[in-house]
Structures are given as structure tokens and as C-alpha cells.
Amino acid sequence: MVIGISYSQEIVVNEEMTAKHMGSGDLPVFATPSMIAIMENSSMKAVELHLATNETTVGGRIDVKHLKPTKIGETIMIKATLEEIAGKRLTFKVEAIVNGDIIGQGKHVRFIVNKTDFMNF
């Protein structure tokens, strides 16, 4: 695993991803919780092939700004780039981009854990 590895995915905003549907607002626009979930997923996917079979990553912190609204039907590219490795702590830069405009950005921290040990909480 090295600094700079990344994962990007494109999604098309649908009704289930809206603030109105999720209950985080009352307008049919891309919801902040949806953006965060996809940012976390992109971060997970960026490193999953670099882990042992008995390891995974779990989210520990997220600090993002949702800068602009996005309508149903618009395509969003969400990218996570690994910026720092500190033992089992991984820090990612996360971005959401629509037509070249950043609509969301921030940092996400994940931790490498042993799957079995983690589930024995």
C-alpha cells in the first residue's frame, strides 16, 4: 500500500439518494449522507486489494463540506485518494465532482482491522 493510490466511481443521482427521500432535508437534491456513504465506499475500495484476506477497513472519522446542490439525473464522480498512512490509520482526500465543479470535499479516516477480532466486540 502506498500514498497516492485512489479509487473513483461515477454515480447518477436517483430518487433514493435525495435529501427528501433520506430524511436529511425536504428537497429532491443529492443528500449529504449519500455523498458521505459513497466517499466512504470509494476510500474502502481504494485500499481493499492491498489488505490481507483477513483484514478490512472501517470508518473512523469524516470531515466533509457539501458545497453545491446536485439534481436527480446528474452524474457525480466521487474520488478517494490515500494521503497518509500511520500504522493502521489511513487518511484519504475525498472529492465529489460534477462537470468539473467540486460539489463536495474533505478528509476521511479509516482503520485497518482484523475481521474476526473486530466482530468479537
Listing of model-derived features with the role each one plays in the protein:
Residues M44-I76:
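Hydrophobic beta-strand-centered segment that forms part of the acyl-chain substrate-binding groove
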Residues V13, T70, Q105, V109:
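Long, contiguous binding/interaction regions
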Residues M1-F30:
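Catalytic strand-loop segment that frames the active site of acyl-thioester-processing enzymes
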Residues V64-N99:
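Hydrophobic beta-sheet segments that form the core/acyl-binding groove
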Residues Q9, G60-I62, I78, F92, ...:
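Hydrophobic residues positioned within well-ordered beta-strands of beta-sheet architectures
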Residues V2-Y7, E83-F92, N99-M119:
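C-terminal binding/interaction regions
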Residues T32-I36:
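Conserved N-terminal beta-strand and adjoining loop/helix that marks the start
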